[in-house]
UniProtKB/Swiss-Prot annotation:
It is an enzyme of class 7 (translocase). InterPro entries: AAA+_ATPase, ABC1_TM_dom, ABC1_TM_sf, ABC_transporter-like_ATP-bd, ABC_transporter-like_CS, ABC_transpr_lipidA, P-loop_NTPase, Type_1_exporter. The chain crosses the membrane at residues 35-55, 64-84, 135-155, 161-181, 262-282, 289-309. PANTHER family: ATP-BINDING CASSETTE SUB-FAMILY B MEMBER 10, MITOCHONDRIAL (PTHR43394:SF1), ATP-DEPENDENT PERMEASE MDL1, MITOCHONDRIAL (PTHR43394). Keywords: ATP-binding, Cell inner membrane, Cell membrane, Lipid transport, Membrane, Nucleotide-binding, Translocase, Transmembrane, Transmembrane helix, Transport. Homodimer. Involved in lipopolysaccharide (LPS) biosynthesis. Translocates lipid A-core from the inner to the outer leaflet of the inner membrane. Transmembrane domains (TMD) form a pore in the inner membrane and the ATP-binding domain (NBD) is responsible for energy generation. GO terms for molecular function: ABC-type oligopeptide transporter activity; ATP binding; ATP hydrolysis activity; ATPase-coupled lipid transmembrane transporter activity. It comes from Cupriavidus metallidurans (strain ATCC 43123 / DSM 2839 / NBRC 102507 / CH34). Belongs to the ABC transporter superfamily. Lipid exporter (TC 3.A.1.106) family. This is ATP-dependent lipid A-core flippase. Residues 36-318 form the ABC transmembrane type-1 domain.
């Protein structure tokens, strides 16, 4: 049973919280000016909190029959002014922080996508499409939303707490010390809950990716699901994942929910102690009615920001967990570039010299001591039973993987001496698994043209003509500018295959790799595609993987692979005459067609 993979490697050591926060801060540093302005704005909001109890204090002590009685109109004017400044400051801080977070979001998302594009092939074997889409599109957005919310609460409410504490010390320092004693107790409780919450968040995220992969499999394979009556099985799979997610969510709710009631209890305890001390002070004329009322009001105003700060723990841990995933992708090593030897256009002399390859920790090597040569312009067919190493061998040519033994030479030079981009410019690839993009016909044919360069439309038309697609394209609503839909869904199977061939023709690379390019087509489509392939192969070194042996009988040479080794090679006639593995495969295939 396949399961979703996380974009971070679980075997790696978990980053420390401080390390993750430092990395997030590194993205915020270029926005230091806006950040400082936002803090100033939030400072004004916090200062406004401390003004209110001071006004109440003076009003009670001086306003009612006291020296302040004739100036009571100042109070509403002051409150209106405070509200106006507070509102403007809140808007300014929100706008500035949104500008910062959206800038960081753009930078992170671009870095993630760039790293994903340049990751080695093994990375895509290790991670599912669902987990990568989740990371690039959703997780990075969640990180910025959560961390921005956390940042606003942390700065604004911390400043509010500071402003109110200053007022409290100014009003009655003895009572304030009681509050100060209880604050570390709140911090201690938060630190205890913190570690468990972070672990639960990390496990919840990994499970979310697995659930997304189940959905991806069900959607991508809907035909198989329906034909085989797999709805109940898929439902049970998804239900199991959903139940586990619910369990983790409840455990997180329990762990996170402890913060608020404990904080509220400690705050109530503090208030009870303060009331007791205040009553003792009142008996000794150490406080006034206004002073005590202002102090209690400031205390009550202090509870809300303290509660907000206590509740920060759960979203902060969720944001840090998602940030770890994002940084795991950003830190993913790119493909090894190796040498920088330039390569304009190769002759196409391709040599496999004692090549071996093993996938990771696999028990058996996929290739063993493979030696063969494809001369410039030669068509070499690779045949053999499933699992014999045909696809692995051709995947080594564009360096999707590097051999674990031996060397591959192009025009006499090991391919890892060439600049990777230059090497891949020499290779065109047409597979049975056609990949087309949700774009126009022209953009698909000229795929890989730099965005700043203009597509050569005349060259596109020539490529389409060589692929026998001119009439098809003329029949489309907007011709070359017609959008072909997701993976070319607006075209038939044969048309999609020929469009992939047109893309290879447009590229005009000296080396061509054909991987079962006609295996999934009907007879008429195969005839058209085969004709297009024949025009494509002219003058190019071609490696052809084929199960249907009738399609490669005219190859210059046929190489038969068995269990990762070259079993035999020669022309079709020579191999039939040897009466070996190829002749046996040929007999079986043609007997089944008779």
């Amino acid at each position: 049973m396949a399961s979703g993979a996380n974009v971070t490697d679980n075997k790696q050591q978990t980053p420390q919280e401080s390390d993750t926060l430092k990395r997030v801060w590194a993205y915020l540093k270029p926005e230091k000016r806006n950040f400082v302005l936002a803090i100033i704005a939030m400072g004004l909001v916090a200062a406004s909190e401390g003004i209110i109890p001071k006004v109440v204090n003076d009003l009670l002590d001086k306003g009612f029959g006291g020296s302040y009685a004739g100036k009571l109109w100042h109070v509403p004017a002051l409150l209106v002014g405070v509200a106006l400044v507070r509102g403007l400051a809140q808007f300014a801080s929100g706008y500035l922080l949104s500008q910062i977070s959206n800038g960081v979001l753009l930078k992170m998302r671009m870095q993630m996508f760039d790293r994903m594009l340049h990751a080695p092939a093994l990375f895509f074997h290790r991670n599912t499409a669902a987990s990568l889409i989740n990371a690039v599109i959703f997780e990075v957005n969640q990180v910025m939303q959560i961390l921005t919310g956390v940042l606003i609460t942390l700065v604004r409410d911390s400043l509010t707490v500071v402003a109110l504490l200053i007022y409290l010390f100014y009003t009655n320092w003895k009572l304030t010390l009681v509050v100060a004693v209880l604050l570390p107790a709140i911090g201690f409780v938060m630190s205890k809950v913190n570690r468990r919450l972070r672990r639960l968040n990390r496990e919840h995220q990994a499970l979310t990716n697995t659930a997304a992969y189940v959905v991806e499999e069900s959607v991508g394979g809907f035909k198989v699901v329906k034909l085989h009556g797999g709805e109940a099985y898929e439902m049970s799979r998804f239900e199991a994942m959903a139940e586990r997610l619910r369990g983790y969510s409840m455990r997180m709710a329990v762990a996170g929910g402890l913060n608020q009631p404990v904080t509220a209890f400690l705050a109530s305890l503090a208030l009870s102690v303060i009331l007791t001390i205040a009553m003792i002070q009142a008996q000794g004329n150490q406080t006034t009615i206004g002073g005590f009322t202002g102090f209690v009001m400031a205390m009550l105003l202090l509870i809300s920001p303290l509660k907000h700060l206590a509740d920060l723990n759960q979203p902060l841990q969720r944001g840090l967990t998602a940030a770890e995933m994002i940084f795991g992708l950003i830190d993913e090593p790119i493909e090894p570039q190796n040498g920088g030897l330039p390569l304009e256009r190769a002759r196409g002399d391709l040599v496999f010299d004692n090549v071996g390859f093993r996938y990771g920790d696999a028990a058996r090597a996929a290739l063993n001591h493979v030696s063969l040569r494809a001369a410039p312009g030669e068509v070499v067919a690779l045949v053999g039973p499933s699992g014999s190493g045909k696809t692995t061998l051709v995947n080594l040519v564009p360096r999707f993987f590097d051999p674990t033994e031996g060397h591959i030479l192009l025009d006499g030079q090991p391919i890892d001496r060439f600049a990777l981009a230059d090497l891949r410019r020499q290779i065109a690839f047409v597979s049975q698994d056609v990949v087309l993009f949700n774009d126009t016909v022209a953009a698909n044919v000229a795929y890989g043209v730099h965005p700043r360069e203009k597509i050569d439309m005349a060259r596109v038309e020539r490529a389409l003509a060589a692929a026998y697609l001119t009439d098809v394209v003329k029949g489309l609503p907007e011709g070359l500018e017609t959008n072909i839909g997701d993976n070319g869904m607006k075209l038939s199977g044969g048309q999609r295959q020929r469009l992939a061939i047109a893309r290879a023709i447009y590229k005009d690379a000296p080396i061509l790799i054909l991987d079962e390019a006609t295996s999934a087509l009907d007879s008429e489509s195969e005839r058209q595609v085969q004709a297009a392939l024949e025009s494509l192969m002219v003058g190019r070194t071609t490696l052809v993987i084929a199960h249907r042996l009738s399609t490669i009988e005219n190859a210059d040479r046929i190489v038969v692979l068995e269990q990762g080794r070259v079993a035999e090679q020669g022309s079709h006639a020579e191999l039939i005459g040897k009466n070996g593995l190829y002749a046996g495969l040929h007999r079986i295939q043609f007997a089944s067609q008779a």
